[in-house]
Amino acid sequence: MHRFLVRRPDAVILLLAGYFLVEFLVRLAMPHGLRYDESQQALFSQWLTFGYDSQPPLYNWVQSIVVSVFGLSLAAISSVKNLFLFLVYISYYRLAREVLTDKVFAAIATLSLLTIPQFFWEAQRDLTHTVAQLVTINLFLCGVIRTLKAPSLGSYIFTGVALGLGMLSKYNFALLVAGAFVAVLMHPQGRARVFDKRFLLTIAISVLIFLPHGLWLMHNLGLASGRTLGIMEQNAPDGAFAKFVKGPLKFLRLILVISAPTLVVYALVFGKSLFRNFGRSNEWTRFFEILLAVIAILVLILIVTIGMTDMRDRWLLPFLFLLPIYLCLKMEIAGIKAADFGKRFFYVPLVMMVVIPVLLLVRTFFPSLFGAFDHYNTPYPAFVQQIVAAEGKKPGLVLTDGWLPAGNLHLQLPDVPAMSLFFPNLTTDYAWNASRPILIVWRPGKDNGVMPVELSNWLRDTLGPQYAAPDTKLADVQYIHGKPGEMASFAYGWVYPK
C-alpha cells in the first residue's frame, strides 16, 4: 500500500474512506455508553434551534437532522462523527493540493494528521464542534487561496459560504479569519482581491448564513460566553506578573505538545533534508507564516487581557493542524522529491490506522489494564432495563442534573423526552400521569445518594412543593466488561402525580 500511495496519491481518499468505515464499525462493537460529546449530541438531537449552549450549532444541526430522519441510535451518532472526520481529511487534501505541486506531498501532509494525538485520538472520541471547525477551516482556506490564484464569482461565493459555516462551527474561527485577512493583504494579489466588488458578495453570504444564530447570540450572550470564559479564567493568578508569565508559558507548552510528535516523525523520515534550505520561501509559505503568526499574537493578547491560564489543547488544534502542509511546502520548494521519502513515511499512518482501532477496542474490552473504566463502560443499558422492568412502565420524562447521564439515558429511551438541568434553556413537552411518571436520575458521589439541590428545586418550582423530596433509590450495576464486584452506582426516583 505504501508503494501504491506513491504511485497513485489520490488513492488516499479511498484509503481514508475505508479507515473511517472501520472506525464506525469499531464504535458499534464497543459498549454503548457515551462519552461527554457523544452524550451531548444525543441529548441535543431533540431540538433544532438557533442556539444551544456555549458552542455554535453547526454540528448540532447536522446531528439533529440525521436523528430526525433515521432515529436516535449509536449508529446515528457515530456515522455523523466519522463522516465529519472523513471530510476533514478530504478537505485537507484538497487544501494541500491548492498550494503543493506534488500530489505525493499532499498525501503526506494529509496522512500526517495521524501523527497528531489530539486529532487521531481525542477527535475520534470527542471534539465534535472542533471537528466541524476543521472542515470549515479547510474549505475557507481553499476558497481564499483559490480566489487569490484565480478569482471568479464562484470562488467568492464559495469563500462566503465557508466563512459563514465556519462561524457556525466554533467562535474562535474568528481568529483564523483575522489571520487570513492579514495574510491576504500581505499577498501580492491580496489587496486587488479584497477591493474587488465580488468581495462584498462574500461578506453578504457569510452574514446571511450566520445571521439566525447571530440574532440568538445577541440575546443569549451570557449563556454562550459564560462557561467558556469561566474555563479560561480558571485558576488565573491574581498578580499581574504571574498573568504575563503563566499564560504565555502554557500557550508555548501546548504548541510544543501538539507539534512535537509530527516534528519527530518528520525528522526521523526526512532527516537532514527537512531542515536543508529551510530558509527558502514562496508566496504560500509566507501566507501560512503570516496566518499563524497573527493567530498566535491574538491568542497571546487574549491570554494577557483576561488572565487565561487554563488552556486546552483542543483550542489550538484548529490552527496547528496546518503545520504538515507548511512543512511539506518548505520541503517542496527546497527541491526535495516526495517520492524519495513517501514509501518510508507512509508506513507511519498505515500502522496508526491499525493501532488506533485496536487501542479503542482494548481500552473498552480490557479496562482493568488501564486501572479505570472509560465512560463507554458505564452500564446505562443494564441500568435502564433493570429499573424500567422493576417499575413496569416507561417514564414520561427523564430528568438529570448533568448532560452525561441525560444523553446516555435518552439513547436508551429514545422515545422518551430527556432534560438536563445543566442546560436550563433547553426544555421540552412531556407527559406526566400515573402511567408516565417522571424519572429523575443522577450519579451519586460521596453524598450517599442525596438528591442534588438543583433537582429538588426543579421539582418544587415546576411540580409543586409536595414533590420536592420524592422517594429515591440506589442501584449498583456491574460495569460493562468489569469484573464481579466492580459496580457503577446510580441514584434515581419515580415521581407520580399526587
Task: Show which residues each predicted segment covers.
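Membrane-interface transmembrane helices that cradle and orient dolichyl/undecaprenyl
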Residues: 140-158
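Transmembrane-helix signature of polytopic, membrane-embedded enzymes
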Residues: 92-115, 134-135
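Short acidic/glycine- and proline-prone juxtamembrane loop motifs at membrane-interface regions
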Residues: 124-132
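Transmembrane-lumen/periplasm boundary regions of multi-pass, lipid-linked membrane glycan transferases
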Residues: 177-284, 295
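Membrane-proximal, lumen/periplasm-facing interface regions of secretory-pathway glyco-
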Residues: 306-313, 336-393, 403-419, 442-448, ...
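Short helix- or helix-capping micro-motifs
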Residues: 16, 109-118, 163, 167
